[in-house]
Amino acid sequence: MSSPAEYYKSLPPISKAYGTLCFFTTVLVRLHILNPLFLYLYYPRVFKKFEVWRIFTSFFFLGPFSINFGIRLLMIARYGVMLEKGAFDKRTADFLWMMIFGAISLLVLSVIPQLNTYVLGLPMVSMLVYVWSRENPNAQINIYGILQLKAFYLPWVMLLLDVIFGSPLMPGLLGIMVGHLYYYFAVLHPLATGKNYLKTPKWVHKIVARFRIGMQANAPVRAPANGNAGTGAFRGRSYRLNQ
């Protein structure tokens, strides 16, 4: 059995970075180094007080230490990691672009009063779970050892459990909406029409190549000398649509 350090080292880069930032954000809140009120997305303060950091920090706060926090962190460690290692294997730039698209979509939807939510880390996790469930619809999932179901239904079951345990409905619902928006334009629409409107931009490929983050076998730009390059088998329907 691998040690915790070896397990952490084996995690794919984007999921590892996102989960780590979420964990340490909550640690800093717990130590009273960060005030959670300064992390929330609150547009009046963003535009009137120029507190632009809220646009970013709201994605890395999953709430205080609690069972719900632990569950969401485990979702990143499980479903985010499986998605990045599975359908997005050797496609780091594409995975990063999915996260960026999700973040932008959540920021836009949060402008609508009826959809407004102050902590965007929660819908971001729901988005990852939704996309994974669409890429692996027939995988068997065991919920708390008492319920077994196909992965396709996982986001909706988790949404129901959130409501049962007293969490707000909107964050999870927003994540499902944005996840479906991504999956429709990145997978379903290209399959139907042959046109992919969500092809990963070159500037995202350049970021991955410049900082040598993970691997991108179908990259339109070259990594720096000594950078990792590779080819191999790809899993998941999304890959074939991003070439």
Swiss-Prot record:
Residues 1-20, 76-94, 177-243 are cytoplasmic. It is a multi-pass membrane protein. The gene is DER1.2. This is Derlin-1.2. GO terms for biological process: endoplasmic reticulum unfolded protein response; ERAD pathway. GO terms for cellular component: endoplasmic reticulum membrane. It is found in: Endoplasmic reticulum membrane. PANTHER family: DER1-LIKE PROTEIN, DERLIN. GO terms for molecular function: signal recognition particle binding.
